Amino acid sequence: MAAKDVKFGDSARKRMVAGVNTLADAVKVTLGPKGRNVVLDKSFGAPTVTKDGVSVAKEIELKDKFENMGAQMVKEVASKTNDEAGDGTTTATVLAQAILNEGLKSVAAGMNPMDLKRGIDKAVIAAVKEIKNISRPCEDSKSIAQVGTISANSDERIGNIIAEAMEKVGKEGVITVEEGSGLEDELDVVEGMQFDRGYLSAYFVNNQDSMSAELEDPFILLVDKKISNIREMLPVLEAVAKSSKPLLVISEDLEGEALATLVVNNMRGIVKVAAVKAPGFGDRRKEMLQDIAILTGGTVISEEVGLNLEGATLDDLGTAKRVVVTKENTTIIDGAGAKSDIEARVAQIRRQIEETSSDYDREKLQERVAKLAGGVAVIKVGAATEVEMKEKKARVEDALHSTRAAVEEGVVPGGGVALVRALQAVSDLAGDNADQDVGINLLRRAMEAPLRQIVANAGGEPSVVVDKVRQGEGAFGYNAGTEAYGDMLEMGILDPAKVTRTALQSAASIAGLMITTECMVSDLPEDDKKGGMPDMGGMGGMGGMGGMM
């Protein structure tokens, strides 16, 4: 085992706080409407320009191991806030830096670190309660657009496009962000269920303009196996032909004789048909087939439950108002499934979301909920250059997370005002001893830090602004964008309550751990010579060569 470098007390904390300050100083320049950009060098391609706190934090690694430990712990604050609320990473970093710096001053003055931490924890509980009290629901499109605008660094177009997307697909609907091909942002909305499987043969296409197979009021056959023998399909195919309705076949795969027969029937006009592979893989495919069955009021023909294709009747088939199959996607619009069955299925998937520990599984389950409950909206981000495209896409994703958080827990006045208003609840607190009181007071000072930083980035005088905001009431605050005082809610400067709450809780949690740190252990720096080849010495003289001719 390698030898370790161990540091104690003040010398450890000084190195740790130096790392914290390096990272926090890089992140906090991005805060507020007049925050600056940070340029990140990449090992390949053009540098990335960003105003996203967590993107900046993730890039920072420090050479000194003890400083790096401090930086990594603050990085954890930004990441945790981003994972939970989707935004507020810069605010959380500024808060953590302020709490830590204030806390270490108190520790140096002889306070008990554990009591300081208890005081901070008490104050956080009171502040979070007050943030919840001053929040108000965010339900109308205008509020959603305002939250999106603020999170996207005051870009109104992004706020409006997110509000429009949420209006069209509902609060539960899936909204995805993609890189567009033009200069303008676009919004595509897909109603009904869409999955990423296209037609198995181009001969199914019946709309040459859009190169798609469009089926009006079709039957939908769902089969959980590979179909290659047409004999199995004949009974159900004949029944569909008699009904004169189109047919969509969704199966694990369809090949050989079975596919050829369907193509011939379609081209001769005997049965209007299209075939696609089932979405997903393995167990997820089985679940998604079941989702489609519930949405369309059909039954999955699966040998696992004793059903076979030869015995299938029209009663086993689902129906929908319309189906559109392109080369890459299949969209089922207005399935005929019972609303109560769909709601029960959605509730079942939501329970699975709560129980799963895998982020990937959770994301896939949420997609399934959205496909059953609402539609799918795609925001295509437009920009002039690749660098701008990446920066803008990151801002749109941030804004989308923020609006979801706002819908979940409501909104509070933005621009650091909510934390200043929550100070009142903290002011009335008393600790069990003098050191806890110091912890409560240091959190009070730290809660002003985001507002101070917003004003500083805008070129204002932080102390003057904080004093004036503190004297005001309710949503009264300072708009750094226009350098005017007024009602933050009326000016449309809103923050999701969840973002403000998570930022404060994450920052206090990590800063509390750092304040109570007494010892740090790290690997010793490696000696550059270590591992090289040993010195081979000179080769010496070659001596007389004798009489070479």
UniProtKB/Swiss-Prot annotation:
Function per UniProt: Together with its co-chaperonin GroES, plays an essential role in assisting protein folding. The GroEL-GroES system forms a nano-cage that allows encapsulation of the non-native substrate proteins and provides a physical environment optimized to promote and accelerate protein folding.
One example GO MF annotation: unfolded protein binding
Compartments where found: Cytoplasm
Lipoprotein among keywords: no
Primary location: cytoplasm
GO biological process, one term: protein refolding
Subunit structure: Forms a cylinder of 14 subunits composed of two heptameric rings stacked back-to-back. Interacts with the co-chaperonin GroES.
E.C. number: 5.6.1.7
UniProt keyword terms in alphabetical order: ATP-binding, Chaperone, Cytoplasm, Isomerase, Nucleotide-binding
Record-stated family: Belongs to the chaperonin (HSP60) family.
Protein name per Swiss-Prot or TrEMBL: Chaperonin GroEL
Listed Pfam families: Cpn60_TCP1
InterPro entries recorded: Chaperonin_Cpn60_CS (IPR018370), Cpn60/GroEL (IPR001844), Cpn60/GroEL/TCP-1 (IPR002423), GroEL-like_apical_dom_sf (IPR027409), GROEL-like_equatorial_sf (IPR027413), TCP-1-like_intermed_sf (IPR027410)
Superkingdom per UniProt: Bacteria
GO cellular component, one term: cytoplasm
Binding site for ATP: T30, L31, G32, P33, K51, D87, G88, T89, T90, T91, G415, D495
UniProt catalytic activity: ATP + H2O + a folded polypeptide = ADP + phosphate + an unfolded polypeptide
